Amino acid sequence: ESPVQVRRIAALDRGNGPRGGGDVELESFDNYLQEMVKGLGARVIPHMITGVENRQNMPFLKYGDGKGAQYDLVAIAAGVNSNIIKMLGDVPGDYLPPKTTRGYICEFRSTREEILRVLGRAVHVFLLDIPRFEFAAIIPKGPFATVVMVGEDLDQDLVHAFLNDPVVQRVLPTNSVPCVCSCAPLINLGARKRPYGNRVVMVGDSGVTRLYKDGIGAAFRTGKAAATCAVFHGVSSADFEKYFWPTCRNITNDNRVGKVMFATNAIMKNSRFSRRAMLRMAQKEQKNKTSYPHMSTLLWNMFTGSAPYLEMFRGTLRPGFIYKLAVSLGASLWPGRKQINKREEMA
């Protein structure tokens, strides 16, 4: 439940959406954005890019039909799963792809009524004591339920361990709902080099993005910074260093705090007592609407990306948070207390 009693999550489809989802009434988010920018004057050229070269200190794009064109500036707004990432070795600056890990996404299809009955209108987030498991979420989208997983060296064994966990089965009995499509996309964990060169700049997932969070938010911020630099200052590597990189650096520094927070979360979720304390603290906050929802706000922001990691970390240093967490930890350790189920879901 949102700690501020408002709905702030929009569940949407990328590209063509799930396999077999052609009858879904909403258009894809990608198409919506493309049509919007076309209405603002952008020109869409439907060419497949098969190569990126540096000719006479200018970027040259090779097309699938054998032709190509030279450009004053090339902004790469592709994801880390795009083939164009592998074509950038010849661009100035010796671009290296970001560090990545694999996630897992699976679409389960039922009926709109059944998904609403089982999942309601809430995103369900799971913190389970499974080796190599970081976190997962189940998101209702009309007749579909989207399962998103993040973990270390994620493989089919880890996927099956999560889907067959009793806590997950209580929320979504995956054995009785067909999985219509799945994929294991790469996730950006951080840039290995500066995401720019002379007349070439990477925005969004191909460059710097927020750790485990919405790519479009970081793409907007870095895209705006790149456009501002190009229009008002220039397109050289030095220009991007001075006017574009500070935005990327802020995201990178915030991600360092995020890594610390996720490492702390991994330690706490693997302890039965700390899991109980987190759950008890969040439950008490949900019941008592007059007190500040410290844990609820932290969990909400951690898994929705509604706040920077630095802001979340500062929230954990508030006396109220520390006091309530200490009380909840003490209650979890107190013998004879009513036990919360051994495996908890944090949703």
Each language-model region and where it sits:
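C-terminal helical "tail/cap" subdomain of flavin- and related membrane-associated enzymes
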Residues: 231-347
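A conserved beta-strand/loop capping segment in the N-terminal third of enzymes
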Residues: 1-32
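Mobile, glycine/GP-rich and aromatic-enriched active-site lid/loop segments adjacent to catalytic centers
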Residues: 129-133, 139-161, 167-190, 197-198, ...
